[in-house]
């Protein structure tokens, strides 16, 4: 659709019907809006944050999960809702058709993702796939698998053998950053699971990913989101 607009406008210019192609802009500037740029961290900050996690004796156990968040653009509620059956290693993709939430009454519920179609597939890089495989290998199987609205096999469980939720990860990110900033003079800006998502989107747009493909992977209803 976008390419058709470009071609059609170029024909109008050639025939002197219009003076300038209204679609002759950088798509990068459309996809990554101001809020995304503002919240995303730089590639250098991302690498430094991940390095610190990987080398820290306590926080290293969260490295694989946080690497995945930086390199898939998943919403944290979608990530928490992932089960073993959502990982397709053969086709190197992640099925995203639900998200896990915990209500103020501490009730665990499964909801549909924000994506209009209700389902999408997010590609896995070799590094992301390796992270998932390590997570599955290190996962301690509980005596009784927790079930939420008929779903089982959640990748991350808390000390009570219940699925981890967004709040868990937000606290982990907070503690990691606090420790980092207590050690290094150059402070790390706020980094949350949502910042990971924005950073992935920004990185992919800057790398030249097809706009419609990026829109699909992110689960956005509009390219400009």
Go through each PLM region and give its residues:
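Single conserved hydrophobic/aromatic residue that forms the stacking wall/gate
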Residues: 1-8, 13
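Detector for glycine-centered tight turns/loop "hinges" at secondary-structure junctions
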Residues: 16, 105-107, 161
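Basic, Lys/Arg- and aromatic-enriched nucleic-acid-binding interface segment
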Residues: 18-76, 80-82, 90, 117-119, ...
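Conserved tyrosine-mediated DNA breakage-rejoining catalytic core shared by Y-recombinases
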Residues: 27-30, 45, 82-140, 147
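Catalytic-site neighborhood detector that most strongly recognizes the C-terminal catalytic loop/helix
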Residues: 32, 40, 99-100, 218-225
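Short, basic (Lys/Arg/His-rich) helix/loop patches that form interaction surfaces
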Residues: 51-62, 122, 138-147, 151-154, ...
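A short, basic/aromatic helix-end/turn motif that makes direct DNA contacts
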Residues: 81-87, 215-221
């Amino acid at each position: 659709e976008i390419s058709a607009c470009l071609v059609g406008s170029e024909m109008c210019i050639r025939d002197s019907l219009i003076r300038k192609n209204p679609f002759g802009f950088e798509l990068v500037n459309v996809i990554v809006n101001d809020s995304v740029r503002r919240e995303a961290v730089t590639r250098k900050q991302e690498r430094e944050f991940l390095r610190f996690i990987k080398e820290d004796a306590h926080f290293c156990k969260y490295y694989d999960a946080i690497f995945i968040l930086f390199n898939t653009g998943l919403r944290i509620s979608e990530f928490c809702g992932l089960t073993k059956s959502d990982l397709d290693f053969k086709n190197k993709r992640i099925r995203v058709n639900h998200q896990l939430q915990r209500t103020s009454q501490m009730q665990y519920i499964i909801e549909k993702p924000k994506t209009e179609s209700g389902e999408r597939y997010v590609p896995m890089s070799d590094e992301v796939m390796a992270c998932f495989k390590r997570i599955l290998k290190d996962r301690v199987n509980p005596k009784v698998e927790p079930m939420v609205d008929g779903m089982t096999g959640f990748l991350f469980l808390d000390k009570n053998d219940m699925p981890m939720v967004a709040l868990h990860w937000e606290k982990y990110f907070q503690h990691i950053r606090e420790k980092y900033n207590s050690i290094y003079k150059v402070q790390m800006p706020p980094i949350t699971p949502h910042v990971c998502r924005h950073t992935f989107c920004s990185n992919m747009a800057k790398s030249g990913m097809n706009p419609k493909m990026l829109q699909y992977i992110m689960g956005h209803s509009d390219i400009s989101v």
